[in-house]
Amino acid sequence: NKERTFIMVKPDGVQRGLVGKIIERFEQKGFKLVALKFTWASKELLEKHYADLSARPFFPGLVNYMNSGPVVPMVWEGLNVVKTGRQMLGATNPADSLPGTIRGDFCIQVGRNIIHGSDAVESAEKEIALWFNEKELVTWTPAAKDWIYE
C-alpha cells in the first residue's frame, strides 16, 4: 500500500478549474495524498521532466505549453496506484479515452490533455524526486484506511 505515483494537473486543467474534480477522483478511489503544490514550472524543470521526449518534434511545443501557466504537481500513495492512476487518467489521446476516465470526461485534444501521470513505478520515483524534496512528502494515516484496505 506504500506505492507512490506522480500526478500533475497541466496548465489547461488548472485554467479550466478541474483541480478539485481531479483530486476528488483520487480521494474517492481511496488513494492517500502525500504531497501537493501550486507552481509555475520553469522551462529547465520541464525539460528535465520530459527529457525522454527531447528528441521528438513536439518537444519544444510541449515545454512551452507546460510553461504557459501554473501546474499542480501531486504525489498519491496506495496499492497499485501507478497502474490504477493511469487507468483513471485514460489514454494519452483523449479521443481514445473511455467515458468515466479523467481525460474521457474532461478533454478533447491530445495537445490539451489536462493531466500527467507516471507510467511506471521507476518513473514515478524519478518524477517525485524531481518535483518534491523529502520534507514535502507528508507521512500520515487516513482515518478511513481500515475501510479501504483489509
From Swiss-Prot:
Keyword line: ATP-binding, Kinase, Magnesium, Metal-binding, Nucleotide metabolism, Nucleotide-binding, Phosphoprotein, Transferase
GO cellular component: a single term: nuclear microtubule
Protein name as it appears in the record: Nucleoside diphosphate kinase
Active site: H116
Organism annotation: Drosophila yakuba
Subunit structure: Homohexamer.
Needed cofactors: Mg(2+)
Top enzyme category: transferase
InterPro entries reported for this sequence: NDK-like_dom, NDK-like_dom_sf, Nucleoside_diP_kinase, Nucleoside_diP_kinase_AS
Binding-site residues for ATP, renumbered to this chain: K10, F58, R86, T92, R103, N113
Entry's family note: Belongs to the NDK family.
